[in-house]
């Protein structure tokens, strides 16, 4: 039986193990897990005490190999009732506890969703699978950010990027540190970790010790994955997903110079006039608060970035603006033919395999690469021999644009052999197309005997010819 149907039956069919309510207040006045409590406005906001912080156990149920606990988490108060219609942030927090717990590291997946409905958001089946396979607690935090929100001087219901763009506009015009929505989004994730640790230590939670976390999330929640790691020492590793925008200013100048316009996916920022602030001191101050690249000296934990070659927001060669400057263990994967949602791809297996490797101390292979000249790519693997290596490429004869919306799912692959008997060194030469542009990358597949699924990683994506057709245009974000 699928978990979703099982939960629906258990939640509403009378077979719930516990339908009691439990409210526990947790003090955040002195937080021992802060990396730099007074560092930036982000640090100060996250670790500012908030009497609204509490959780309520709504349901507990037996789901085969796991116990599932559904909690309502109140993470904070952001702004006032005079400024926004819903200042108190509430979330569903689904905690999946395997019956055989093997690790005190836990996965926290930061998710989205709407606060418009009172119905319980069911745990994602894939996350329950990861919990059972890994022998670790896996949690899913929903409604990050709380949405929709209606701001008093605006009157519109704002979701996702429209909400964030509005908050940026308020900061840029007022300079008030309270405005960037990344602050409450990050605080929600930190409070979720507090809640998981506290709840799991109770009788109802199974008296389980949760010592540290691997944090993951996609898009806006991928950005929050980075900032959560920047502020909290419990974060052991991160999997930021489809948030290929670190070092955002040069990255989005590159975006405009490649396209000659801003992709519709970032239209909410353009509509709010955010583009016009790019080179201003105000924008630089905003980036000091919310931009993960500004915290890179803190982000030394293992990090595995999962991106899409056909993302509607970000160019596939955006890695060039940040990857080499990240410190500590790092890997990246561009999912071929993936778009921003990563729907109908095997991206979740990368999260599962990578997480499994981290919590069970299985060495993740290291991949180094360089391109000495356009079209030339060398790569070296250490730590394990790949089971398969492919070169992927896609062409666009009309534009330097590889979005799925533009070229479809047109990436194709062929096998690549190593250059020597070690099986660890690879060297390829990709020719430029007769017309237009070609994007390409190398993909490596590894299979550890103790891991339930393969682990894939790639080089960064390269584009040939390495030219920007709209370099002389004026663009900003």
Could you say what each language-model-derived stretch is?
Residues 50-100, 141, 177, 182:
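N-terminal cap/lid segment of alpha/beta-hydrolase-fold proteins
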Residues 92, 104-112:
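Short beta-strand element of the alpha/beta-hydrolase
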Residues 353-393, 415-420:
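Surface beta-strand/loop "capping" patches
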Residues 172-219, 235:
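Gly/Ser-rich "nucleophile elbow"/oxyanion-hole loop immediately N-terminal to the catalytic nucleophile
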Residues 299, 305-307:
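Short beta-strand/loop motif that positions the catalytic acidic residue
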Residues 121-139:
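Short amphipathic alpha-helix adjacent to the substrate-entry channel of hydrolases
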Residues 112-115, 138-190, 245-258:
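Cap/lid segment of the alpha/beta-hydrolase catalytic domain
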Residues 227-276, 333-336, 342-346:
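Hydrolase active-site cap/lid region
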